[in-house]
Design a protein with these regions (language model features):
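Carbohydrate-interacting/catalytic domains
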Residues: 1-144, 149, 178, 471, ...
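Core domains of carbohydrate- and sulfate-ester-processing enzymes
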Residues: 68-129, 198-206, 212, 241, ...
Length: 665
């Protein structure tokens, strides 16, 4: 593979691009402002679709873009137009954010040159790369999903000039918060340069999430005004305190959208090669965005691998989350867990030890692939999300299903006899209702998105505790608080990796909006001054307990087998009376209570779950030489007092005379 992009030497810059269908390619050189084209030079063919040109006298900091000419026949997937300035697919930096304009989508000869509308690629000498260190994150840890801009936009302790940027994540106040939650790794929602969907600007809206990239390496200047160095420094600062960094990357589509979308980069260079097409020439839309990246094309495959290696080598990230990951595994249109790209990622010497997380669905044929990725890929587990919500909503017959989810979802991840779960357990994520909204809204409230509430999922498996949305009724407020505690406790008690979305630990709300991608405003910005500090303290106590009791974060499936030489089963499932759940209990559709008793050589942990609305006294089995104590001091109740309805309590069994494991304030 030829080296693509801009390679800087002491004598000048070598520019290289690839296109299998273009007849001519140029590089346009701009002045230091990026506003004036000062030279347009034709690249020379080097065979197999590669074009290159060495330009003497240019130095780091030079601004440029590509242009391509060839047939223009959109009905056949050919979009060549030399009036369209194109971002280098290998751009590591662009000089300004993208902004949608109708001329970017104009047909050939219908609009003026687009150079004035386009960011320019900056030829940069990459900063000195940090040493490549093993990932800090290990399966079973806590992933903290966050939107860089929304997370610190309103944080009072972060300097104004840093708010909403990657650099803010290294601020001491942010690090302290992450440490209190026991965060193993932050998962940054997309930080690469993206463009608004064309319907948003007329509505006065903008894309707040970033899942609409143009190219894959260049960081968004709004999120990383300091460029790659800013990301590198932040990753290093977080690593210094034991927190890894995972990047959420979008390789399934780009912001060039459908046939009515803008021509920004890949479309103008070789639309037929970079995107998947139907036999009639139309774009395949397995993503719901108008196009689908052709990850089975060798040049695209290498570009994805180069991007991943870039962020490992240059920024030191722990790993990646892959949005709509089945697209990466589609070969000739069908998903294959052994597809060349997935196999290459898993076996690449730079990438093979990284954290790899798949969102295991897209909207294409057979797009739901939960459990079908191969190790080492972890997978977002939406069945966990839905089943936990159903249990706490009060659905009948959910006790057995809840136990399976708590135990690592062996029905999903043990199909091939794997010994450990690859589940990423979560109850709420960026896409959907927040944790607080799950217990306050029965239906979505997306009118602010400008689509007459048509967007977003309709089945949220949520409940409102008696009133839809805001209320001043104390009883409803308390019920919602209790439900959030119960949901958090269930998550932290679950085997395998867990994920918490930023702000859910202190009751953030989006006012019922379950698709807030277009709300770059107070709907998504975290309100640090109005957070529920009692809920936050409870989340911190849960984190401390999970760290103190390894059985909670172990990724091995719970099977009721003895733990090592202790003879104590790894799990026992009990009724509230302390007796093993019999088949009739498992099949009792009215049952909403159970105890998960985790075994350990030095003592057991009891997770007592009361999903009923009525309080109940729970009884735990006693052992000579051991004593049950509250595992979290804020739940300091004895076993003679009833466990309140819709709550979870933790008791730890220690040898007589020893203290408990977890603390909370």
């Amino acid at each position: 593979m030829n080296n693509l992009g801009a390679a800087i030497t002491s004598e000048g810059i070598r520019f290289a691009a690839w296109s299998s269908s273009a007849r001519r390619l140029w590089v346009s050189i701009f002045d230091e402002t990026g506003d004036h084209e000062i030279e347009r030079l034709e690249l020379q063919p080097e065979g197999e679709g590669f074009y290159a040109l060495f330009v003497a006298g240019l130095a780091a900091g030079s601004r440029y873009g590509f242009r391509a000419d060839g047939d223009y026949a959109p009905e056949r997937g050919l979009w060549f137009d030399p009036d369209k300035l194109l971002t280098d697919p290998y751009a590591a930096e662009v000089d300004r954010p993208y902004a949608y304009h109708w001329r970017l989508a104009a047909r050939r000869n219908e609009g003026a040159d687009t150079a004035s509308l386009m960011p320019k690629t900056v030829a940069k000498a990459l900063p000195a790369a940090p040493p490549i260190l093993p990932p800090l994150f290990r399966p079973g840890g806590l992933i903290y999903e966050l939107n860089v801009r929304a997370f610190t936009k309103l944080h009072p302790d972060v300097p104004q000039e840093q708010r909403g940027t990657i650099a803010a994540l290294a601020h001491p106040a942010i690090i302290e918060h992450l440490q209190k939650l026991g965060v193993s790794a932050v998962e940054l929602m997309p930080v690469t340069a993206s463009i608004d969907e064309r319907h948003l600007p007329p509505l006065g809206l903008s894309n707040a999430w970033g899942y609409n990239p143009v190219t894959f390496m260049a960081l968004d200047p709004r999120l990383a005004p300091g460029g790659l160095t800013e990301l590198q420094d932040t990753v290093t600062a977080l690593r210094r305190v034991g927190i890894g960094t995972i990047l959420d990357l979008v390789f399934n589509h780009t912001g060039e959208s459908d046939r009515l979308g803008p021509t920004l980069s890949l479309r103008g260079l070789d639309n037929q090669a970079y995107y998947r097409h139907r036999p009639d020439g139309g774009l395949v839309n397995d993503t719901g965005t108008g196009n689908t990246i052709a990850c089975d094309h060798p040049v695209v495959r290498e570009m994805v691998l180069d991007t991943l290696r870039h962020f490992v080598r240059q920024a030191g990230v722990d790993g990646f989350r892959f949005d709509l990951a089945p697209v990466l595994g589609r070969f000739d249109g069908l998903f294959d867990p052994e597809a060349p790209l997935l196999r290459a990622i898993a076996h690449d010497p730079v990438l093979c030890d990284r954290v790899l997380i798949a969102e295991p669905w897209d909207i294409g044929a057979n797009g739901y692939q939960l459990g079908n990725f191969r190790p080492p890929f972890l997978e977002w587990n939406d069945r966990y999300r839905d089943d936990v919500r159903r249990f706490w909503r009060g659905d009948a017959g959910m006790v057995g299903t809840l136990a399976t989810r708590l135990a690592g979802s062996s029905d999903v991840f043990n199909r091939a006899g794997e010994p450990a779960s690859r589940s990423v357990n979560f109850i709420a994520a960026h896409d959907g209702m927040t944790l607080a909204d799950i217990v306050a809204y029965e239906r979505k409230h997306n009118a602010d998105n400008g689509e007459q509430n048509r967007d977003g999922h309709n089945d949220n498996l949520s409940w409102n505790n008696g009133v839809e949305g805001d209320t001043n009724e104390a009883a409803i407020i308390k019920a919602r608080f209790d439900d959030q505690r119960a949901l958090l406790a269930t998550l932290f008690a679950s085997r395998s990796t867990i994920m918490l979305t930023a702000g859910d630990e202190f009751g953030r709300t989006q006012q019922g909006n379950n698709n807030a991608y277009a709300q770059d405003n107070a709907i998504t910005w975290l309100d640090w001054t109005g957070r529920d500090q009692a809920l936050e303290r409870y989340a911190s106590a849960l984190a401390a307990l999970r760290q103190a009791v390894p059985a909670l974060s172990d990724t091995r499936f719970l099977a009721g087998e003895p733990v090592e030489a202790s003879g104590v089963p790894d799990v026992a499932w009990l009724t509230e009376t302390g007796e093993p759940l019999a088949e009739t209990d498992w099949n009792d559709s009215s049952r909403h209570r159970l105890v998960m008793l985790l075994g350990g050589e030095d003592g057991r942990l009891a997770v007592m779950i009361n999903g009923d609305r009525r309080q109940c006294v729970f009884t735990l089995p006693a052992r000579d030489g051991f004593q049950w104590r509250p595992a979290i001091e804020t739940q300091a109740i004895d076993l003679l007092r009833p466990l309140p309805g819709r709550s979870v309590n933790f008791m730890i069994e220690g040898r007589t005379g020893n203290g408990g494991a977890g603390k909370g304030s």
